[in-house]
């Protein structure tokens, strides 16, 4: 397919880091299934990235979304996203019509400053043999959701479970000052784990979930609203625990302890097939094409209905007795 990509804003001061990542991912894609084109008219699909700018959400005003509504898709990896237009979102909404207009992304388009460099540089040869994986599961993260708050309150019977509140650590700053020791510690701790716990945070998706796959470690997913990305057979490697069962997390992980080696292998296979740098551009295109083929209502019709509704509301305000 022919693919055209643009950041949602251009010029001095515009945020466009995801565009550069996309370009690199396309160049690295294996096999090279798709052609990068400069002409939106020529493209089969249009991918718009960095919708959130300093002035807020800019996706609605982008001219390509209006000109080519049925082949234009938003890419975004933030936690709190104004999800109005079809696309691939890290935190895609769960609802009656989610499958028709949205798919779930990883955090591959995150700004490089926000990624753990040790995880990004990981090679399978760095992995520890099973006998040195001495932690049943771990979680180190911010206290930013009730399910995490409950997790931090738990008292575990097993000494090989590590749960830490790291709310004082800010991974989402551009400066590297003070980040290296914590990032190295997180990486080294993860390598010792049989499972990595991935509770939801501000959004249902978790960066550490995809880090776990990259490290060949099976995730325990504690996020009822999370929509699994299409492609991987998640049941082969992930353990899903309902948020209401957080008190049973130790019991559930213990019951599956003997499966960690094979689940870890399957997790790494999923990463290599769908989320690794050589695979992710193809995954995004496949997800966008899936939306185009399966959505219930064409986007052009959705946009026309929104414009009609806005027009009727404006007219109603002008009529006698209408709202001022």
Task: List each language-model region with its residue ranges.
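Residue-level detector of anion-binding/catalytic polar loops
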Residues: 218
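C-terminal "capping" alpha-helix adjacent to the active site of nucleotide-linked donor transferases
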Residues: 240-261
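Nucleotide-sugar donor-binding catalytic core of glycosyltransferases
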Residues: 1-207, 215, 223-236, 256, ...
